[in-house]
């Protein structure tokens, strides 16, 4: 999706950045959807709903379609200022916001394990299921970085330095996400 990200950056880069706090690149959902629309139009035409990975697993367990705001922030289809799906960004991808999941908090109990899921997995029917969130924010949280000024260093396939703040720092060179803790953020490299 490099060509699609490059085109987005050239034509809509500033507008996308103002809403998503990220520059168009191959890691975001928006250019990936455009790639799918251009390269696999039949498959794209069959899309009814768009799930993020963890949300699909949770849907299998609960029959509830939703995602958390941190996951949404990583899609480049979400207005981080208004904390909602952005119709114009969705239109760039060739979709509408109603194809995307309702937004909830990562800690919200969104449903319970259904009978069908219990039978398929061995999990106890009726077990409460929370929304959950992205891997990196949970790594930041689990490392103990839960106060302004704390820093985490992630050494993995994709290493990151994350500084905990009480506001976003929109910068073309940073990746900005909300923290798991209300009112905090973790912009980083």
Task: Please place each PLM-identified region on the residue numbering.
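Glycine-rich phosphate-binding/catalytic subdomain of phosphoryl-transfer
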Residues: 1-189
């Amino acid at each position: 999706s490099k060509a699609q990200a490059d085109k987005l950056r050239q034509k809509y880069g500033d507008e996308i950045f103002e809403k998503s706090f990220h520059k168009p690149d191959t890691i975001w959902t928006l250019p990936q959807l455009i790639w799918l629309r251009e390269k696999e139009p039949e498959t794209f035409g069959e899309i009814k709903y768009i799930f993020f990975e963890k949300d699909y697993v949770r849907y299998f367990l609960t029959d509830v379609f939703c995602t958390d705001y941190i996951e949404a922030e990583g899609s480049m289809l979400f207005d981080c200022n208004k904390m909602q799906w952005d119709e114009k960004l969705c239109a760039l991808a060739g979709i509408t916001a109603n194809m995307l999941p309702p937004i909830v908090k990562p800690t919200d109990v969104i449903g319970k394990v259904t009978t069908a899921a219990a039978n398929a997995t061995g999990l106890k029917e009726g077990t409460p299921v929370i929304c959950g969130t992205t891997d990196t924010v949970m790594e930041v949280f689990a490392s103990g970085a839960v106060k302004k000024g704390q820093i985490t260093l992630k050494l993995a396939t994709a290493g990151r330095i994350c500084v905990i703040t009480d506001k976003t720092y929109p910068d073309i060179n940073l990746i900005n996400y909300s923290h798991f803790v209300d009112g905090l953020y973790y912009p980083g490299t």
